[in-house]
Amino acid sequence: MPKGILGKKIGMTQIFNEAGVAIPVTVVEAGPCLVVQKRTPENDGYSAIQLGFGVKRENLLNKPTKGHLNKAGVRPVRFLRELKVDDLEAFQVGQEIKADIFAEGEKVDVVGTSKGKGFAGGIKRHNFHRGPMAHGSKYHRRPGSSAAKGPARTFKGRKLPGHYGVERVTVQNLQVVKVDPERNLLAIKGAVPGPRGGLLLVKNSVKVK
């Protein structure tokens, strides 16, 4: 059954296994999350649950969000995200989901928003090759030709310098090394997208190796 939880990236550290090998891990504060709404095939055309995570002062909520949360009978939450599920009967509105839904050794996919790098050139943004660095060269880090003479314009979708980062990124098949159910912490092997404090969605892997 698909399962997932919203969380916050705490940072990276390392854990030593039984053989004394240091494993780099990312610590994620996973939950607790609240089930705010259930999406049914009859009303919405698909099966999903809406999860709420984080704490937000009630006076900062707008009226539609406040009414939505009051209807569900849950406390004010900072983030609302949907997660597709198969069995809606396993979830109830107001139910709390914690980090103990995952077990040590389980493979997960982590979805986050990548760090923003600002305005970047083609070499950094798209891995372009640079030009000759000789003294006579007038072409070092420029993008080069962007189109032919025939159309006399640049087509949409052309790889050019521009804003880099702040994109939805999914890292697949990461291993859960340790679970701390008391503090709702997950230690996930490797790096995950985004800065410290960034919102993450941790869900069971769809391409288990």
UniProtKB/Swiss-Prot annotation:
InterPro entries found in the cross-reference section: Ribosomal_uL3, Ribosomal_uL3_bac/org-type, Ribosomal_uL3_CS, Transl_B-barrel_sf
Protein's UniProt keywords contain Transferase: no
Recorded GO CC terms: cytosolic large ribosomal subunit
Nucleotide-binding keyword on record: no
Region of interest (Disordered), ranges: 121-154
GO biological process: translation
Subunit structure: Part of the 50S ribosomal subunit. Forms a cluster with proteins L14 and L19.
Function: One of the primary rRNA binding proteins, it binds directly near the 3'-end of the 23S rRNA, where it nucleates assembly of the 50S subunit.
HAMAP family noted in UniProt: Ribosomal_uL3_B
Name this polypeptide is given: Large ribosomal subunit protein uL3
Underlying gene: rplC
